Regions:
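Beta1/beta-strand and adjacent pyrophosphate-binding region of the FAD-binding site
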Residues: 53-64
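N-terminal Rossmann-fold NAD(P) dinucleotide-binding loop
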Residues: 67-68
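Glycine-rich FAD pyrophosphate-binding loop
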Residues: 76-95
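Dinucleotide-binding Rossmann-like beta1-alpha1 core, especially the glycine-rich loop
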Residues: 98-224
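Active-site substrate-recognition segment that forms the wall
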Residues: 100-101, 105, 109-148, 285, ...
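Short beta-strand to alpha-helix junction loop
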Residues: 157-170, 193-203, 246-266, 377-382, ...
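Helical element adjacent to the flavin cofactor pocket in flavoenzyme catalytic cores
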Residues: 202, 206-214, 241-302
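C-terminal catalytic lobe of FAD-dependent flavoproteins
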Residues: 218, 351, 392-472
């Protein structure tokens, strides 16, 4: 394949900390200076930075899939748009996720919050949830709030807000990908939720119930059926008597999430959008709009969109607005499977929280949640424990990276993102807090926000995602 960004070299991954790639190699930064389509796109996207002040209708801060999709939808609605990040588009959590576009996901994300759950992780670190003790203590109020949002009434509300998004998420992804010539990275075939015990399977009954309510198709598989669907899994060594799986048939996945975001960004540039490198912490609210100093000049826009993921709160606090945003970290590592073993779709171990995804660069192992400070050093034990559990299922060979990738997921206590206008600051818009759903929901929430900014009727009712729900 010819996309420069997909060449995930060990040195690049070793330098990736907290979801940002440091000192990115020239090829991975878009081939600047090249004469092919990638180099031309980069030059065009950066060319207008030479003027001292440039004015736009909207500046989008954050170039992960959420920000890139928002910017492209705004551009296609006829607005003059600047996309801004401090590094290459798609270099954060959008780069390192499991690459699944979920049709399922009707219950709030499984972050521990009850006293029983907290005691469980306190005395037993796992690949599903690991923690730094000081961070765990600091997050206790947030975790209790999250636990309350997982009650029956709150969970029912969550399902009804998220169900319309799930219903269109796959198609929105595919439409955007086709227009960006990135559909070659997508594969059908769904993904597997693997359960090693009956009790683990029973705990997920609410997910299956809401799937039936909202028409999301799935298949229940026993051990022998799992082995037929994924012969590369070591079913015989995985307590086959109790092994079950749910095959979410309408989900899809990608072989290279970073390349998908890169392709969408390049399409934004080809269609007349502008890209700037700048530090969003320098954002200033001036009369009539927003001002930000970039590497090669000043960017001014009438409206600003905060799509900075786990860094969104840093900017908003300086502007006098605050949201209960917590950060959950996650890791990935690529391996070359032994003995010719392979997977044809992502597989998630529901008991241990890791995902095995076939990618262009081998099998990607992504971990569960780590409760630690966003910018704290990586904890190598997290990926080591996940690998130990994963090798029960597939024989993993040597790592294809020097060190694990580490990313930060922005989480709100009700497990829903904020998408809409600031309730207190004029001409400020938000699109962040997607937790583990950024890759799935980025294209659709980007469209919904763009339609609101442009004064169009949104495809779906966005009121359930409004920032107003956090106004006291």
């Amino acid at each position: 394949m010819s996309v420069d960004f997909q060449a995930e070299t060990p040195s690049a991954c070793a330098r990736a900390t907290a979801g940002r790639v440091l000192n990115m190699p020239a090829r991975m930064s878009g081939g600047g200076g090249g004469t092919g389509p990638a180099g031309i796109a980069w030059q065009r996207g950066m060319a207008k930075q030479t003027s001292k002040i440039q004015s736009f209708e909207v500046m989008v801060l954050g170039a992960g899939i959420v920000g890139v999709a928002t910017a492209l939808h705004l551009r296609r609605l006829g607005l003059d748009v600047a996309l801004i990040d401090r590094t290459h588009p798609g270099a954060g959590a959008s780069f390192g996720n499991a690459g699944v576009v979920q049709r399922n996901g009707f219950v709030p994300h499984g972050v521990p919050g009850s006293a029983r759950e907290l005691l469980g992780i306190l005395f037993r670190q796992s690949s599903a949830v690991s923690y730094d003790l000081a961070t765990l203590i600091r997050l206790l109020p947030w975790l209790r709030r999250h636990h309350a949002a997982g009650g029956l009434r709150a969970a029912d509300l969550y399902s009804r807000v998220v169900a319309p998004l799930r219903a269109v998420a796959v198609q929105e992804h595919l439409d955007l990908a086709r227009s960006a010539n990135a559909d070659r990275f997508y594969r059908q075939g769904g993904w597997l939720h693997l359960y090693r015990s009956g009790s683990c399977y029973d705990r997920d009954e609410a997910e299956r119930y809401y799937a039936r309510v909202f028409g999301a198709a799935y298949e229940e598989l026993l051990a022998d059926e799992i082995g037929i669907l994924e012969p590369g899994l070591k079913i015989a060594n995985s307590r086959a008597a109790s092994l079950k799986a749910i095959h979410w048939t309408e989900s899809c996945s990608v072989s290279n999430p970073g390349a998908v975001v890169d392709a969408i960004w390049r399409t934004f540039v080809r269609e007349g959008g502008e890209y700037f490198r700048a530090d969003a912490r320098q954002l200033q609210h001036k009369r009539g709009g927003w001002r930000l100093e970039g590497e090669r000049g000043t960017v001014f826009a009438g409206k600003a969109v905060i799509a900075l993921g786990a860094w969104s709160q840093d900017i908003l606090k300086g502007l006098g607005e605050s949201y209960p945003l917590a950060v959950m970290r996650g890791y990935h590592m690529h391996y070359r499977p032994l003995s010719g073993a392979s997977l044809s779709r992502p597989v998630v171990d529901m008991e241990h929280g890791f995902v095995l995804t076939p990618t262009d660069n081998g099998i990607r192992l992504t971990t569960g949640l780590e409760l630690a400070e966003r910018d704290a050093p990586p904890n190598p034990n997290v990926i080591a424990l996940a690998r130990k559990r994963a090798e029960d299922l597939i024989p993993l060979g040597r790592p294809l990276q020097e060190a694990p990738w580490l990313g930060a997921r922005p989480c709100l206590p009700d497990s829903l993102p904020v998408v809409g206008a600031s309730p207190t600051i004029p001409d400020l818009w938000m699109n962040f807090g997607h937790a583990q759903d950024g890759f799935t929901l980025g294209p659709i929430t980007g469209r919904l926000l763009a339609e609101q900014i442009a004064g169009k009727s949104p495809l779906l009712d966005p009121s359930g995602l409004s920032p107003l729900r956090f106004v006291a």
